[in-house]
């Protein structure tokens, strides 16, 4: 794979009704209903809204045979009114349901974690090699008849692995690792290959963007080693709602799309399903617009490991680089110095003059030719000011340069000035590739100067900025190249929105935490409580608990598994009933929905993690995710 130049991975074509996937086809957009699948009228109406918004596939939960059989009625309801969208059945726990669904849906999604293996209980299981082989044979014996039904009905299959629902068998042998997730998928793919069943799509998802990106990269590598080219379905599970859901999805999905991986995407938002479609479309269009871009002549650093990257080794300069958290730079050249009360930048670029009033705890950056060494200020140079940089005695300097200006003279200057922090600029259509090329070239040259990525936009809506900036920063963060972020926007957005987006990107990439994190699913027909209003109530009660991770899950499919990545969890347990978790341990079951948020707060308080709300505008508590 070329790290610096965009092209899509070549994949096999899969027929899904009249909307083929993979191969020469465009990246497809899809969503999932959250209405009860036995409610034909509600499902048809919601599916139409998804299609009208631009969705190309509609998935429905089929938790039982009755739901699977009702897909026929939903199909009739759609087709009789001119909606020919392929339907995808989502199956967990019961392979018999998959057999039935394959007769009515254009595609069936099965979950390797619970297709034959029992549901996850977090028990450590011991197998001899012979016993483990026998378990694999059980999968084959059950899976092959299902594939035969799919062949007879021209039904495609998605093998959909979720981080939150790996089986105890896989967990016991491989641990909670990307390798385990990949093997969970490959066990089923090998059977498909043996049976010459090729209408297969794969997904490996997690709410943890780092795990999701690393696992998909590894899966593609393993498939290539075994001669497979199945298309990929991308998504970040439980991404959440609003700003958080958009940034997290853009970061994870965008990082993979930027590397040419992915044939269909679903942006999982805890909102109405049709609201996911415009976000997904913007993300796909932004990435694919860089096709046939001018070539970037980059050189990969010799010690870089794409499948398991570590943070690039840099020399710390004050609080930038080394083991420090990535910093946030912000622009205030328009003279408006307001800051977000929760997300105050570490450095503010003021340009030609300091503001009359400065923000406590904030450092300021001035153009080098007007910098006079004022307290808490630092000079900024461009690549044409190397002589001025040589005569400057500041212990921290910022050098703004694009990759194509990284000449021998600039490299030589950086070797003489380890106190210089490089601010990488790019106006290239593939700015991810050019930023990568600069960071790799510094490493090739033996330089350990920290790198901050300057991203220039002209957006008028927060959503557009969140999608584009998230997609641009994803690969750079997951590659371990990011020592800081600088978002510059010439649209109508306030500085507060831009700053919040920058901090949100660092949190979504798990390299700097500055607020409460929510792991919330989008809901489906299994969800038996009002997910959106519940999320709003939980956020209202806990949004000030910075650094805490709270899971809000509609059902038990991924709920308990995702709790391993959360501090506390709120999981649907039945109609109007909720279970509460402390990490992956269920603390209290079957709480009435109307009491559950209050009980959650009591649980957080009992464990000493609750703080009363204050009106303080102090900087947020921060910690690094390990």
Swiss-Prot record:
- Name of this protein: 4-hydroxy-3-methylbut-2-en-1-yl diphosphate synthase (flavodoxin)
> Pfam family example for this protein?
GcpE
The UniProt gene name for this protein comes to ispG
Give residues annotated as binding [4Fe-4S] cluster: 521, 524, 555, 562
Give the protein's function. Answer: Converts 2C-methyl-D-erythritol 2,4-cyclodiphosphate (ME-2,4cPP) into 1-hydroxy-2-methyl-2-(E)-butenyl 4-diphosphate.
Q: Gene3D superfamilies this protein is in?
A: Dihydropteroate synthase-like, Sulfite Reductase Hemoprotein, domain 1
UniProtKB keywords: 4Fe-4S, Iron, Iron-sulfur, Isoprene biosynthesis, Metal-binding, Oxidoreductase
State the family it belongs to: Belongs to the IspG family.
Give its E.C. classification number. 1.17.7.3
């Amino acid at each position: 794979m070329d790290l610096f130049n965009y092209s899509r991975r070549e994949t096999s074509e899969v027929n899904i009704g009249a909307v083929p996937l993979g191969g020469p086809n465009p990246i497809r957009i899809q969503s999932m209903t959250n209405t009860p699948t036995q409610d034909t009228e509600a499902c048809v109406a919601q599916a139409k809204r998804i299609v009208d918004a631009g969705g190309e596939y509609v998935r429905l939960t089929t938790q039982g045979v009755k739901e699977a059989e009702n897909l026929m009625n939903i199909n009739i309801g759609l087709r009789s009114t001119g909606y020919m969208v392929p339907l995808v059945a989502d199956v967990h726990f019961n392979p018999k349901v998959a057999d039935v669904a394959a007769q009515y849906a254009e595609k069936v999604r099965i979950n390797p974690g619970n297709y034959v293996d029992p549901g996850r209980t977090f028990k450590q299981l011991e197998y001899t090699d012979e016993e483990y082989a026998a378990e694999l044979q059980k999968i084959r014996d059950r899976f092959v008849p299902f594939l035969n039904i799919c062949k007879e009905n021209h039904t495609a299959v998605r093998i959909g692995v979720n981080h939150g629902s790996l089986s105890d068998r896989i967990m016991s042998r491989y641990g909670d690792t990307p390798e385990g997730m990949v093997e969970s998928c490959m066990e089923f793919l090998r059977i498909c290959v043996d049976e010459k069943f090729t209408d297969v799509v794969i997904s490996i998802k997690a709410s943890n963007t780092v795990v999701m990106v690393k696992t998909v990269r590894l899966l593609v590598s393993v498939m290539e080693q075994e001669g497979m080219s199945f298309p990929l379905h991308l998504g970040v599970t439980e991404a959440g709602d609003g700003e958080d859901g958009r940034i997290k999805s853009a970061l994870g999905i965008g990082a993979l799309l930027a590397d040419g991986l992915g044939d269909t995407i679903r942006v999982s938002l805890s909102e109405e399903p049709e609201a996911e479609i415009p976000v997904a479309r913007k993300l796909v269009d932004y990435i694919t617009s860089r096709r046939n871009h001018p070539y970037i002549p980059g050189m990969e650093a010799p010690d870089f490991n794409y499948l398991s990257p570590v943070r690039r080794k840099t020399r710390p300069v004050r609080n930038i680089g080394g083991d420090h958290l990535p910093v946030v730079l912000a622009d205030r050249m328009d003279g408006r110095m307001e800051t977000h009360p929760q997300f105050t930048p570490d450095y503010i670029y003021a340009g030609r003059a300091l503001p009359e009033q400065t923000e406590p705890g904030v450092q300021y950056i001035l153009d080098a030719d007007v910098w006079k060494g004022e307290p808490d200020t630092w000079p900024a140079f461009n690549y044409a000011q190397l002589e001025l940089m040589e005569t400057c005695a500041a212990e921290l300097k910022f050098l703004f340069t694009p990759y194509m200006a990284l000449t021998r003279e600039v490299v030589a200057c950086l070797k003489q000035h380890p106190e210089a922090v490089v601010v990488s600029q790019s106006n290239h259509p593939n700015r991810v590739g050019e930023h990568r090329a600069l960071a790799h070239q510094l490493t090739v040259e033996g330089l350990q100067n920290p790198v901050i990525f300057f991203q220039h936009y002209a957006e008028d809506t927060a959503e557009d900025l969140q999608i584009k900036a998230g997609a641009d920063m994803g690969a750079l963060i997951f590659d371990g190249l990011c020592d800081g972020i600088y978002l510059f926007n010439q649209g109508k957005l306030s500085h507060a929105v831009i700053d919040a987006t920058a901090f949100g990107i660092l949190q979504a990439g798990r390299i700097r935490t500055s607020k409460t994190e929510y792991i919330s699913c989008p809901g489906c027909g299994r969800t038996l409580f009002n997910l959106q209003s519940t999320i709003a109530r939980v956020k209202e009660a806990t949004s000030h608990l910075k650094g805490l991770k709270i899971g809000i899950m509609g059902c038990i499919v991924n709920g308990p598994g995702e709790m391993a990545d959360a501090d506390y969890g709120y999981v649907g347990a039945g109609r109007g009933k909720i279970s509460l978790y402390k990490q992956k341990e269920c603390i209290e079951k079957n709480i009435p929905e109307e009491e559950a948020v209050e009980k959650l707060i009591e649980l957080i308080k009992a464990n000493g993690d609750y703080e009363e709300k204050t009106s303080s505008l102090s900087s947020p508590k921060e910690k690094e995710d390990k």
